[in-house]
Amino acid sequence: SVLAERLANVLGQRVLIVDKRPHIGGNAYDRYDDHGVLVHPYGPHIFHTNSEDIFEYLSQFTDWRPYQHRVLASVDGQLLPMPINLDTINRLYGLNLTSFEMQDWLDSVAEKLDRVETSEDAVVSKVGRDLYNKFFRGYTRKQWGLDPSELDASVTARVPTRTNRDDRYFADTYQALPKHGYT
């Protein structure tokens, strides 16, 4: 859609976009339900970037509602921050680590692997087997319908692990939702 907009508005070309689905927007499609609630049928799509140019370009087409996504995972009877951070580890294991000690702790539980090929490998090599089982294995199986050992490492490699208390899912400078939805 960006290419179509640029062709039309910069080069004066006529553009036709054909969407395979019966609505515009692809997976970012959203709609208001009968109660006025904005629904994302394909799951939430949170805009995030570190690029001021991209943010300014898109700001021509929408006003923004600032939004920083935070996730709590239900683990062992507790609601814990996800991505895994300092508070996650301290609360889950009853520790009192500092941010300086956190990386050493992660290194001590991480599995040393010669090759990281699967999503399981990617996670256990960063946070160890226990955290993998508590946070990643079941969720990844539910989301993808496959065991993480059957998925490429890139599937879970993008999920960060933080050594500080930052509990935002994304750390990008610009995080928001279009004020009136994507579509």
Predicted feature residues:
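N-terminal cationic-hydrophobic initiation segments that often serve targeting/anchoring roles
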Residues: A8, S59-T62, V124
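Glycine-rich FAD pyrophosphate-binding loop
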Residues: A8-D34
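Short His-Asn-centered micro-motif
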Residues: V18-K20, T49-N50, H180
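Structured catalytic cores of enzymes that bind and process phosphorylated ligands/cofactors
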Residues: S1, V15, Y169-F170
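Dinucleotide-binding Rossmann-like beta1-alpha1 core, especially the glycine-rich loop
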Residues: H35-E111
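Active-site/ligand-binding neighborhood in enzyme catalytic cores
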Residues: D76-Q78, L86-T183
